[in-house]
Every structure is written in C-alpha cells, then in structure tokens.
C-alpha cells in the first residue's frame, strides 16, 4: 500500500533542500565579504602602526634636537 503522505513529504523535503541551498549560497557570500573586510582592516592596522612609529620618531627627534615647541593655544 502506498503512503498517502509521501507526496506531501517529498514536496516538503524538496522545499527544505532548496532553502538550505539558498542559505548556503548566502552564507558563502557573507564569508567572502567578511574576508574582504578583514583584509581591509589588516591594511588599516599596518598603516596605523606605521603612523604611530613615525610619530614616535618625530617626537624623539624634536625632543633631542630641542626643537619641540608648546602647542598652539587659540584664546577666542
């Protein structure tokens, strides 16, 4: 005897499989974007470190050469 619910179960399973496939696609795209964001953040981190080292070098040079001046104050 044939299962009376087999067609409904088969249709439901097909919809689930289709939904999971779309979900996997979406997650793959999110992962790609996340990798791109991580890469850009890493680049920003490197630039930030370079700028901090440069600032430390400038501060050291100005202190050692006696050329460091007080910051400008605006008395408006």
Curated annotation (Swiss-Prot):
GO terms for biological process: attachment of spindle microtubules to kinetochore; cell division; mitotic sister chromatid biorientation; protein transport along microtubule to mitotic spindle pole body. InterPro entries: DASH_Dad4. Disulfide bonds: none annotated. GO terms for cellular component: cytoplasm; DASH complex; microtubule; mitotic spindle. Keywords: Cell cycle, Cell division, Centromere, Chromosome, Chromosome partition, Cytoplasm, Cytoskeleton, Kinetochore, Microtubule, Mitosis, Nucleus. Its main location: nucleus. It is found in: Nucleus; Cytoplasm, Cytoskeleton, Spindle; Chromosome, Centromere, Kinetochore. Component of the DASH complex consisting of ASK1, DAD1, DAD2, DAD3, DAD4, DAM1, DUO1, HSK3, SPC19 and SPC34, with a stoichiometry of one copy of each subunit per complex. Multiple DASH complexes oligomerize to form a ring that encircles spindle microtubules and organizes the rod-like NDC80 complexes of the outer kinetochore. DASH complex oligomerization strengthens microtubule attachments. On cytoplasmic microtubules, DASH complexes appear to form patches instead of rings. This is DASH complex subunit DAD4. The gene is DAD4.
């Amino acid at each position: 005897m044939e299962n009376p619910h087999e067609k409904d179960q088969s249709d439901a399973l097909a919809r689930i499989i289709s939904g999971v496939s779309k979900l996997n696609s979406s997650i793959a795209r999110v992962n790609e974007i996340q990798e791109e964001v991580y890469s850009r953040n890493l680049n920003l981190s490197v630039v930030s470190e370079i700028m901090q080292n440069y600032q430390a070098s400038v501060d050291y040079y100005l202190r050692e050469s006696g050329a460091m001046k007080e910051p400008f104050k605006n008395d408006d």
